[in-house]
């Protein structure tokens, strides 16, 4: 059958009748006049303190999200009750939709359930379902679903649609179909989103007849298809070689007021390219040109290559996508000889192109593609450009893009700006890619950038906190001798104490004294906190206590204190006032 024939055009009627009661109350009435003689002055009501209007919900949600993401749960559990937040379904749901780490999201969900006067509703439950479903934790998702049933929480079409989507995405089409039937049996009427998701699942599983029946049922239920519904139909038709029928739907949907959007056009052209349907692609490109719709960069590149292979003109494609002409020119005009000599003018031009794409268009996917091409062709970019790429990728938490740019700088022998190295270190620490931190520090030292006393000590401490004492020692060894002060030595001692190796900490102390570096208050606190727990260093503990007492009594550490001693004390002293 032809899908384009299944259309309806039912006029919508509006009633203009007014209720007689409303007409009666709409007649003009005289207002009683109050006598000034007996009128009473309004009582003064004590004004309530209004909340600070500058504190927006998005700021509250962002604060809670940062606590969940960057703190361990014990710390987060202590901070959350003291935020002064009125915990309601809206706030809880917004926090969950911000996608904190899955485990933290579940702990936060359970923590919120214990708040006095708060109960989870179907909004928060459905969001928690989505989090587990997106992570592929289908059994956990089902557990939350059963919990909803036990608690008597309303289960609506939105909840069922989410379940059907994630269950089908996991490959269990039969399970998704059972959920569909359960939804219908429970009286939940499907929406256009439900119908569309279910049809897409059936088409993908090759159940064309069932998908067709669902579409007919959708029309009989007077649910109007939207752009995504038509896109699902056209995507299936193009994949089966029925491009004329797909075009028929493409134009008829416009006649009834549904305009194909950017997502629809990109999906259709990607599908047409996959099956070599260039004529269909041309018809869609004409519509895109008339309506100002553009392609995503990867699809544009694929379309460019397909038209070139077919010997067809790409003028229309370039005209529609003039916004990415910089990328296309760069990808086509680069010398294809890998060992070609690159002069200063060419290098400057390529740097300008990359800067334009990154800083003006913020198209980081395109930048990744260009970097790979330039690495293959041995083209060297300016240091400030590669540094900007790394910093922008780190700002957006794109670890892959930042790693790609860093690897490119290594191969090309490019020394980066200090801010780029620090951004990389922070990014790799957050993503727990600790061995890469050492690579960055090595390159930073080669580029003659200094970590500094504070950052060096903090990095050593952070690697020790991640239970990687070997990496912490590597960072210490990479530091120049003039940066191996009391803060760095104390940080390394703290690493070994935490790792259960007090003998190594004492060895570091002896090495520090040999270099005539005097311990600070923080050094004594670190050593005593670890050595007091073992009976192997009783003599050393007694001596360290005596030295610490002498240091405190002399008050030398409070008056003319060296900056390194002050940093060490701020980082490691336990009761510094």
From Swiss-Prot:
GO molecular function: mRNA binding
Domain of life, per lineage: Eukaryota
Family: Belongs to the PPR family. P subfamily.
Sequence ranges of the PPR repeats: 121-155, 156-190, 191-225, 226-260, 261-295, 382-416, 417-451, 452-482, 485-519, 520-554
PANTHER family: OS03G0856100 PROTEIN, PENTACOTRIPEPTIDE-REPEAT REGION OF PRORP DOMAIN-CONTAINING PROTEIN
Keywords: Repeat
Lineage: Eukaryota, Viridiplantae, Streptophyta, Embryophyta, Tracheophyta
Pfam families referenced in this protein's UniProt entry, alphabetically: PPR (PF01535), PPR_2 (PF13041), PPR_3 (PF13812)
Descriptive protein name: Pentatricopeptide repeat-containing protein At2g01390
